[in-house]
From Swiss-Prot:
Source species taxonomy: Eukaryota, Amoebozoa, Evosea, Eumycetozoa, Dictyostelia
GO molecular function, one term: DNA-directed RNA polymerase activity
Biological role: DNA-dependent RNA polymerase catalyzes the transcription of DNA into RNA using the four ribonucleoside triphosphates as substrates.
Gene: polr1e
Entry keywords, A to Z: DNA-directed RNA polymerase, Nucleus, Transcription
Disulfide bonds: none
UniProt subunit comment: Component of the RNA polymerase I (Pol I) complex consisting of at least 13 subunits.
Protein name listed in UniProt: DNA-directed RNA polymerase I subunit rpa49
Cellular component annotations (GO), alphabetically ordered: RNA polymerase I complex
Domain of life: Eukaryota
The family this protein is said to belong to: Belongs to the eukaryotic RPA49/POLR1E RNA polymerase subunit family.
Subcellular location: Nucleus, Nucleolus
Main location (coarse class): nucleus
Species of origin: Dictyostelium discoideum (Social amoeba)
Length: 375
């Protein structure tokens, strides 16, 4: 290395793609996560980076803290064997704090802080200000098995809290609707889609076939209802790629729900459309009753519930106001006059235009009809 030259890169010349050293103080993610090609997201609005790792069975989130000191600077040395040049690139040291994704979603309706939320606050305080002994105790509690991260225990605790809340609200909560906020004046907050679809289900929805249709890499199958083709055509004009993916996932959930209702109690039609067994079990848990590991039953009341959910998701896709519901109704083999009752059920104002055209708009605060409807 007698002819070694050193090139020091100034931080202002790095642009947006600045290198970063990630410090996993709670232990490195399991190799099984890394092999799944985890996604790195650089947050432009906040001085932080996120690393999200997802699999079918475990969901972990790493949120970083900037540990740089004003008294010390760090850099990465990159040596080029061909030119014998050593580049010195300034970098930041980011400590990645680990937590379970989605464990507070089912507790949004409660004003009382949950045990999981309290534990998470304590853990963050311990990581930031705790002594070495405190940090070791916290790590021992949570990191004895880094591949599980007590995810199963956390889920059971959440289910227990959810059941307690359900018992309290059972006399008031309609069984044919998801959880809702009847007090808000913002229509976007009445039905929380993120609470309806837990992260493990949302990320498990196979939206790729719809993305392929939008990008013209494949054609829409002939059996796909016109409503879905029209929505995908509309998505082509959306510039935000994340919004397109989000909408495709909601549309995928609607498609799976329709198939569930029409597939006569068998899993095969859903599996053919790329639906995982975990998503199938979730659909059956909210829309039907399980007979065995391959069969389920959908009652007439279950169908009414599916129609209500489809109305809510359709409203979400079109900013809570739909000019004409005819296409969606036809995809369910219903008339507009028949399907409009389900928009009324979820709290919409319906405007009738002629014999078949129906325009609907969700109104806030929510006012539900006193009686349910049947088709």
């Amino acid at each position: 290395m007698s002819n070694l030259t050193v090139n020091v890169i100034e931080e202002k010349n790095l642009g947006d793609n600045k290198p970063c050293v990630l410090k996993f103080s709670q232990g490195l993610p399991p190799l099984s996560f890394i092999e799944k090609e985890p996604e790195f997201i650089s947050m432009s609005t906040k001085n932080k980076r996120h690393r999200v790792v997802l699999t079918n069975t475990d969901q972990l989130e790493y949120e970083s803290e900037d540990k740089d000191s004003k008294y010390a600077k760090y850099a990465i040395g990159i040596f080029d064997k061909n030119t014998k040049q050593l580049k010195i690139v300034p970098t930041k040291i980011q400590t990645m704090n680990q937590s379970v994704i989605g464990y507070t979603l089912t507790l949004d309706s409660s004003s009382v802080i949950s045990r999981e939320e309290r534990y998470d606050k304590i853990k963050k305080l311990a990581d930031s200000f705790g002594s070495k002994i405190t940090k070791k105790k916290m790590q021992k509690m949570e990191m004895e098995n880094v591949e599980n991260l007590d995810y199963e225990k956390t889920t059971k605790s959440i289910d227990a809290v959810k059941n307690e809340l359900a018992d309290i609200e059972s006399n008031e909560k309609p069984f044919d609707l998801p959880d809702f906020d009847a007090e808000t004046n913002d229509v976007r907050k009445i039905y929380n889609i993120e609470a309806i679809l837990p992260p493990r289900i949302f990320f498990g929805l196979n939206h790729q076939p719809f993305l392929d249709i939008i990008s013209k890499t494949s054609e829409a199958p002939s059996y796909l209802p016109e409503y879905f083709k029209d929505q995908l055509k509309r998505f082509e004009d959306i510039k935000d790629e994340e919004k397109v993916v989000y909408n495709c996932k909601l549309l995928t959930f609607m498609w799976y729900s329709m198939i569930l209702m029409k597939s006569k109690g068998g899993h095969e039609p859903l599996i053919k459309e790329g639906c995982t067994s975990e998503v199938i079990n979730f659909l059956v848990s909210i829309f039907g009753s399980k007979i065995n590991h391959k069969k389920y039953n959908i009652s007439q009341d279950d169908k009414l519930k599916i129609y209500n959910y489809l109305a809510i998701f359709a409203l979400k896709l079109e900013d809570f106001q739909i000019t004409d519901i005819k296409s969606l109704a036809q995809s369910l083999s219903l008339t507009s006059s028949s399907f409009e009752k389900h928009f009324t059920r979820v709290g919409c104002k319906v405007v009738r235009i002629g014999s078949e055209k129906r325009s609907v708009r969700l109104e806030a605060p929510l006012k539900l009809p006193k009686a349910r409807f049947s088709n």
